[in-house]
């Protein structure tokens, strides 16, 4: 077993945990990047600080309000879809928003698989390279799973992220 296979095995075994509850609230990921679900978008108050919403669900919608721009990256939640190009595109947007200090909310329908995978990809991309990948990955995964109750339950998405960044 080589190092990459060993890391993948450790991460796969360490992330095989049960869902404790489904996420309801928006979670602050960084100073300007947030993770949520479709319901969070529908229930946004009239005064919100989000300037961009990244929608990675299949549902295309327009907000009645004009103070928020919705960017749609349609992504199915199944075991056969490739998420790599979506991670790259969403990471580009999130890096740009972060650098310009523009608040952005990333969501899918439930805020569990698609949007969580995009967030994990973003965090892997911007991580401190002095911290070993496997340690950082497990830290982020378990922290967000603890906060949100469910986080990247689609094992195909999880494996694709591992393969992309190991």
UniProtKB/Swiss-Prot annotation:
Show the disulfide pairing: none
GO cellular component, alphabetical, reads: host cell cytoplasm; virion component
Question: Would you identify the family this protein belongs to, as annotated?
Answer: Belongs to the protein-tyrosine phosphatase family. Non-receptor class dual specificity subfamily.
- Predominant location of this chain? virion
Please list the residue ranges annotated as the Tyrosine-protein phosphatase domain.
25-166
- What is this protein for, i.e. what is its function? Serine/Tyrosine phosphatase which down-regulates cellular antiviral response by dephosphorylating activated STAT1 and blocking interferon (IFN)-stimulated innate immune responses.
One GO MF term on file is:
protein tyrosine phosphatase activity
Which catalytic residues are annotated? 108
Catalysed reaction, written as an equation: O-phospho-L-tyrosyl-[protein] + H2O = L-tyrosyl-[protein] + phosphate; O-phospho-L-seryl-[protein] + H2O = L-seryl-[protein] + phosphate
Q: Which SUPFAM superfamilies match?
A: (Phosphotyrosine protein) phosphatases II (SSF52799)
- Origin species: Fowlpox virus (strain NVSL)
What is the name of this protein?
Answer: Probable dual specificity protein phosphatase H1 homolog
Q: Where does this protein reside within or beyond the cell?
A: Virion; Host cytoplasm
Tell me which PROSITE patterns the record gives. TYR_PHOSPHATASE_1, TYR_PHOSPHATASE_2, TYR_PHOSPHATASE_DUAL
Entry's InterPro entries?
Answer: Dual-sp_phosphatase_cat-dom, Dual_spec_Phospatases, Prot-tyrosine_phosphatase-like, Tyr_Pase_AS, Tyr_Pase_cat, Tyr_Pase_dom, TYR_PHOSPHATASE_DUAL_dom
Tell me, which GO biological process terms does this entry list?
A: symbiont-mediated suppression of host innate immune response; symbiont-mediated suppression of host JAK-STAT cascade via inhibition of STAT1 activity; symbiont-mediated suppression of host type I interferon-mediated signaling pathway
What is the induction comment?
Answer: Expressed in the late phase of the viral replicative cycle.
* Pfam families assigned to the protein according to its UniProt record, in alphabetical order: DSPc
């Amino acid at each position: 077993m080589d190092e990459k296979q060993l890391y993948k095995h450790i991460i796969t075994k360490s992330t095989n945990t049960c869902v404790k509850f489904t996420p309801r609230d928006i979670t602050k990921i960084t100073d300007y990047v947030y993770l949520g679900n479709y319901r969070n978008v529908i229930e946004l108050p009239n005064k919100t600080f989000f300037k961009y919403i990244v929608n990675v669900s299949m549902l295309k919608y327009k907000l009645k309000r004009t103070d928020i721009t919705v960017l749609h990256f349609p992504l199915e939640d199944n075991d056969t879809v490739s998420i790599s190009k979506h991670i790259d595109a969403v990471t580009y947007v999130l890096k740009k928003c972060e650098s310009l200090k523009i608040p952005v909310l990333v969501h899918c329908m439930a805020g569990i698989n698609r949007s969580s995978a995009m967030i994990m990809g973003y965090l892997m991309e911007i991580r401190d390279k002095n911290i070993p990948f496997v340690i950082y990955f497990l830290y982020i995964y378990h922290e967000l799973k603890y906060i949100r109750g469910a986080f990247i339950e689609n094992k195909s998405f999880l494996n694709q992220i591992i393969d992309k960044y190991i």
